[in-house]
Amino acid sequence: MTTTPSTTPTVTTVTDPAGRALDSVDALEAGLAEQQYIADRGLATTLFLALKLQKPLLLEGEAGVGKTEIAKTLATMLGTPLIRLQCYEGLDAASAIYEWDYPRQMLYLRTLEVTGAVERERARHDLFSEEFLLKRPLLQAIDAAHDRSPVLLIDEVDRADQELEAFLLELLSDFQVTVPELGTLRAEHVPVVILTSNRTREIHDALKRRCLYFWIDYPTFDKEYRILAAKVPEVPARLARQICAFTQGLREVDLFKPPGMAETLDWARALLALGSRELHDGAVNDSLGVILKYQEDVDQVRGGVAADLIAKATRAAAD
């Protein structure tokens, strides 16, 4: 980190751990696929532009569609640290950016008093040095300790209070944080910033303007099948097609919370654990709690709706 006058932060060339340059959408899409993340062309293009233009990327979509996973996958693919800020109501600057280590500061003062080495100006300077600074995720992301750009995941930003967005604006505009006692701390390596939102509230326009944007929808049948085959390869092909057809059908039912891709993967593993080789009434009704997380949805689907979806899934898998 540096407090020198404003300069353009250095940016590490975007490469994977093997040194291969991710210099095209195709290369990025292939790199994600190697990490078992199946991205459609639109998402891969937007992510490529975010990397190339050094712009934050705001991903919105329903819960469970893979927004958080892409940040984790990207960090693995780039061989760089993942720094995560999990947002929640009441999140403040002390938890998101920094705070002073008050207990250690007091201990330091007492030590100076005991040794008779108290000098007001020296003590004040020492107390408010980086030694006593507790760096939270946003400050960690611009820390000079990184030898390449980390991935900063600001997860579920819509759950945080709007006041947090004001703190984010400075970071996302200039990749810097101002600490009154230390000055302005600037990134030496621009972090790759991914923000996610489930759209429980609208994000302020000023924050959106600083980001590229992409909406991640529920996957199509073909994409869901490819993801399932990559993530849970031990699932027989016929059962995998049935699972995907069933979950696709569930999303057309008027549910409080339709299943996302995460639930599809969990359900596939659950069915394997139950010894199921294909969908049938018993296995489906017994395991609905894996893919549906509200009792009202379970009650609605169990029985007739499940039977209809099983029949449709069986026909779809046979096509």
What positions do the PLM features span?
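C-terminal regulatory/interaction module of P-loop NTP-utilizing enzymes
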Residues: M1-D319
